[in-house]
Amino acid sequence: VPSLQHLKDGYYQILMRESDIPFTAVSTPSGMLWEWLVMPQGLSNAPATFNRFVSHILRSVRDFAPSYFDDIFVHSRAMNGMTDLEVHRMHFRRVMEIMKVNKLYSNLKKCIFAAFEIPVLGCFVGKDGVRPDPEKIKAINEWPTPQNVKNLRQFLGLATYLHKYSKNYAGIVHPLSQLLKKDQEWQWTDECQNAFLTLKKSLTEAPILALPNPDKPFYVVCDASNFAIGNALMQRDDDGHERVISYCSRQLRGAERNYPVHDKELLSMKYALAKHRVHLLGPEPFTVFTDHASLRTAIKSPHLSQRMARWLSFFSEYNFTVEYKP
């Protein structure tokens, strides 16, 4: 059960230190000087100060009440024989007590209490997982065929924002990205049109991504093609079904396209571990699945190129096993 607390007036809830008040003086057309008694917007250290302040006072409840600037996200699950709503009520009360002691005030018009899902940084998070903003999906679905480079850049800007919901995004978008190269003549071919329609379909039919559960093992599925690499971070839910937490992909750079297939697959694995480092780095073991069987023994081979030796040094930070999955 999630809830959203939106703090009222943000920066203005932090008082200025008395000795710093004169430094905030601003001149008005009437010739008068006005000084800020609370922290104004525009100071270079204001965002960090505000975020640090909110995070600090909520440090004792950060396991179920993380914050991001003026938003506090309270989430709860059933535990110890209590329902999720009962646990949520207890968690929410603790957060409110902390806010009361520290004189933090909420904007009730923007707060959401015990909802099915809440908006978080451009997406919606709920019990079932994470889904994209329907307004952005609608914009993608209704986007007309680009007529020039500017139109294409605008479309890809929005599409890239949603790329974590699309399997093999980099591979699909490859023909379109070629049109953005310097001195490239604009030619909208059938291949570009198919890529455009495929990308729209991939995003409009985006799956609901699962929320990561640190108590369950992670596994990563990697793959590589002639011009792109991609991966998916996954877990199994309580019913044993595979759930995707995030898709991730990118196109191969100039020199990387000349790598042999073995090295491309290994690069895909390295890219996956780097992208999902926050979830995978640690003592808990996880599994990497690949469709290239030789990678199972690559990390133990005594004959390594300098490039592979560097990559294996990177892999040594992680506790994982490689399994073949055709």
Model regions and ranges:
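Retroelement reverse transcriptase polymerase core
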Residues: 1-287, 294-311, 317-320, 325-326
